[in-house]
Amino acid sequence: MCVQFVSSYGLILRMSVAISTSHRRFSTVAIIGKHGEFGASSSALGELADFLDRRGHQVVFESATAKDLGRSNLIAMTLEQIGRDADVAIVIGGDGTMLGIARQLAPFDVPLIGVNQGRLGFMTDITFERMLPVLSDMLDGKLESERRTLLEGVVHRQGKEIFRSVAFNDVVVSRGAGAGMVELRVEVDAHFMYNQRSDGLIISTPTGSTAYALAAGGPILHPELGGIVLVPIAPHALSNRPIVLSDSCEIVVELASGRDCSVNFDMQSLTSLYHHDRVTVRRSEHSIQFLHPEGWSYYDTLREKLHWNEYPSVLGQLK
């Protein structure tokens, strides 16, 4: 942290001070692992648990992670219990794992640390190989903190609510695999914006702007920007371009025509849509706190994950 005081000469002096908060701030640490064949190995999870225990933290495991580990002396908790009792949660997996965990823990405001065992690792930015030394520094208070927004969406059919969910990346209204284009009527804050014929519409948070929205031609939004981006998917009219809105807006998408349509939230929960169903999307009241290693930068993440400043060689390899 930075301590600021005024000297006898009226000069403002600043000192950078690293304060150990391992026992005060992070007393109870939860470990949540990716399950199944490609999850973290039992030996790696056990090594992490032993490391945290030696540091004096109380270690708890998400229930399925504890079952995968196979030890008898573990404290196992549901995600709801972790949300109530843990001071921080370490999530080991890929971005998909982090998406699901973040959505469920957002109402509890538990800080999340991501250890990457997936492919890209936009949100799980600690490499598996350097997990222990990096976590040691972070749990001593040498870290960066940031907050990310979520979206909440409600589907109404004939005036009645039929489905509700939240999204960390995006809410996507899309056509069925065997159907033609859909026609969507879009309103923003009760103002008609347009009718759009396309394969669908992506409504994205700044976090999701580097995911499906980016692949569909949308802009990258900095996570600290209070915005929501609408990105058409393969629009019939080339004039239907992405647009960035304030995250204070309420967006309503009505299915004017189309077959086998659906709306999904982070590709993890979905429901079918019928003619004249209305999807209302707004910023959620909850947010997610991510903790990163000291010196972390969003621009470093973009440069590394999107391979900026790298150019193909004559052999086709990036340099």
Feature names for model-found ranges:
Residues 14-88, 92, 100, 129-146, ...:
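ATP/NTP phosphate-donor binding region
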Residues 173, 189-192, 239-319:
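ATP/nucleoside-binding phosphotransfer catalytic cores, i.e., glycine-rich phosphate-binding loops
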Residues 119-199:
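Catalytic core of DAGKc-family lipid kinases
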Residues 191-239:
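Gly/Ser/Thr-rich active-site loops/lids in small-molecule metabolic enzymes
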